[in-house]
Design a protein with these regions (language model features):
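A mid-sequence, solvent-exposed acidic-amphipathic segment
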Residues: 137-205
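Short beta-strand-to-turn element immediately C-terminal to the catalytic PLP-Schiff-base lysine
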Residues: 159-160, 259-261
């Protein structure tokens, strides 16, 4: 029997205090995702958007809406920000429909992405050996349990300097997998914008290509090294260059391309 990846819409709502101190609920985004770990997905999404800075900004996360068949899912989720956390409403101007291949499609402007708080990337913290780097594609694939079943999911791993896969998330969309990874780190209180440097000795490895948005998300999470099995975009290369991160593409056992930040690799 052929197993198929499930893809369902998820509508993300945010409840927050407006400028008048009134509780406001707004629909922020609809994304096509692989169900499961929706709390991590929405937490990582809001962290990457600069709407929350840590788990302390959140009081509740809950799913709601009609139960849909045949998978018995609720496809709406609401994250409530803590009382007194008055969010600048301009942060909600970046409303968009997010499909499984392009999370950034429909953004108000590319410039809005660069307005996000991006920490200063550590210039010396992370270094990985060439031989270790070459082993990572096979380790990523081994860590993708759901991909083994369906062949239809992207994977993103958090990796240590010695090549250990610390965490892997999967989703039909690369940007969702990244949000799930970042979101779990926030939910575990490992990651917050108030704790810069905690990710300085980590890297991310993506099963597909390196897009502007994925590199941006890694920068918001203060991760200095981004590698991908596929090709990077020109905007991703420019972003890595601007903020000083390492960007590797076409990573395979036999070779790879370094687009920026070669000083974090040694032979």
């Amino acid at each position: 029997m052929d197993l198929v990846t499930v893809e369902e819409p998820l509508e993300i709502w945010v409840a927050y205090e407006d400028k008048q101190g009134e509780l406001t609920e707004t629909s922020l985004s609809i994304t096509m995702r692989t169900p499961g770990e929706d709390e991590a997905l929405v937490t990582g999404f809001l962290f990457s958007e600069g709407i929350i800075r840590s788990l302390e900004d959140v009081t509740n996360i809950s799913t709601f809406g009609p139960v849909t068949e045949p998978y018995s899912l609720q496809n709406q989720i609401k994250i409530t920000l803590k009382s007194g956390e008055r969010v600048a409403e301009k942060k909600f101007q970046r409303h968009f429909y997010s499909n499984s291949s392009c999370g950034v499609c429909g953004k108000a402007s590319m410039a809005a992405l660069e307005m996000l708080h991006l920490p200063a990337i550590d210039k010396t913290g992370f270094r990985i050996h060439d031989k270790t780097l070459r082993k990572l594609p096979s380790r990523l694939q081994e860590s993708q349990a759901e991909f083994e079943k369906t062949g239809g999911l992207h994977g993103i791993s958090l990796v240590s300097e010695d090549g250990e896969i610390l965490l892997t998330k999967e989703d039909v969309g690369r940007h969702n997998a990244m949000d799930k990874l970042i979101g779990q780190l926030v939910l575990e209180q490992t990651l917050s914008a108030n704790n810069e440097g905690v990710m300085k000795d980590k890297m991310v490895l993506v099963s597909g290509r390196a897009s502007f948005e994925l590199v941006q998300k890694s920068l918001v999470a203060d991760i200095p090294f981004f590698s991908s099995i596929g090709a990077p975009s020109s905007a991703a290369i420019d972003l890595a260059d601007k903020y000083g991160s390492t960007l590797v593409g076409f990573l395979k056992e036999k070779d790879y391309n370094i687009y920026h930040g070669a000083h974090r690799i040694f032979w």
